[in-house]
Design a protein with these regions (language model features):
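Glycine-rich phosphate/pyrophosphate-binding loop regions near the starts of catalytic domains
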Residues: 1-124, 196
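Glycine-/charge-enriched secondary-structure boundary and capping motifs
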Residues: 29-79, 142-272
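A general structural motif
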Residues: 82-88, 125-134, 176-188
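A glycine- and small/hydrophobic-rich beta-loop-beta segment
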Residues: 108-112, 119-149
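Short amphipathic alpha-helical segments, especially helix-boundary/capping motifs
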Residues: 15-17, 135-139, 189-193
Length: 272
């Protein structure tokens, strides 16, 4: 999803580098590496994406002794995936920076199959859902219906909205209402618990409000859900229900300061 804001002619033009890190040398870690590589390979074959290069770091363990004990630390299996693609015209690319429009609106788009992840279900995503999301977003970037975009990843929807606020130094006001895409499966209360922090595939896009109905209709035909998540305005993130019950109301400066704390403390320890 990190590449989707740049116009790419097709998914098959994307090339992937895979860097696997593991503490191999035992049956468990060797098997996990084999299963991980196979899963990535199968997924990329379904997407028609090649993995021409990669790198392996398979000695990710260390041991040391003290006077009384021996210690061993093993790295868990991880795959670092880097994707690149040729771009015909970089001037068509969009970013997280809002564009001037008469009636700015933010919308959350995600595959319909996300709605099947009830309660504690293990997240998964099908190649068909990736293709649909890619095609929908790319088409509407090219025709300039999508003006800005940020993918939903670590931290879920709420972090995505917060990062948009930090980038643009503009807040968001969002009145949460029952959404026809979700209210058949989740109550409003469950939506508020699940969706703000769900780290499932999706994106928040800036559009002009006059195009919302047309875009939502187009998304529905591609098995993609789309719902409004507020308007960029002011200097606060203000999320309320239709009954004016406050869910979140924070100054974006305070949120950005809290958001930066982890990086600040890591840097302070590392650079000391």
């Amino acid at each position: 999803m990190n590449l989707v804001s740049v116009p790419i002619s097709s998914l098959s033009n994307i090339k992937v580098s895979a860097n696997w890190m593991s503490a191999t040398g035992n049956n468990v870690d060797d098997l996990n590496l084999r299963l991980g590589v196979q899963a990535l390979s199968d997924f990329c074959v379904d997407l028609n994406i090649a993995i021409p290069v990669g790198k392996d770091s398979l000695s990710m363990s260390t041991t040391w002794d003290s006077e009384e004990h021996s210690f061993e630390v093993n790295s868990p299996l991880s795959g670092i995936i880097t994707a690149v693609a040729n771009v015909n015209d970089v001037r068509q690319a969009i970013t997280t920076e809002y564009q001037n429009t008469a009636h700015p609106l933010l919308a959350y788009v995600f595959p319909d199959e996300n709605l099947a992840l009830e309660k504690n279900a293990i997240p998964d995503i099908s190649p068909d859902a990736i293709k649909s999301m890619f095609d929908f977003l790319q088409e509407n970037i090219r025709n300039k219906s999508i003006l800005a975009l940020h993918d939903v990843s670590d931290g879920g929807l709420l972090c995505c909205l917060s990062e948009l606020c930090f980038t643009n130094k503009i807040g968001i006001t969002w009145e949460v209402a029952n959404n026809s895409s979700t209210d058949e499966i989740f109550t409003l209360e469950e939506q508020l618990k699940l969706f703000p922090f769900a780290e499932t595939i999706g994106a928040v896009i800036q559009i002009d409000a006059k195009n919302y109905d047309l875009l939502r209709s187009s998304a529905k035909q591609m098995d993609i859900s789309m719902c409004q998540v507020g308007k960029p305005v002011g200097k606060r993130i203000s999320i309320k229900t239709k009954n004016n019950n406050v869910i979140l109301d924070k100054c974006i400066t305070d949120l950005e300061r809290a958001w930066s704390q982890t990086s600040y403390h890591i840097k302070a320890m590392r650079d000391n």
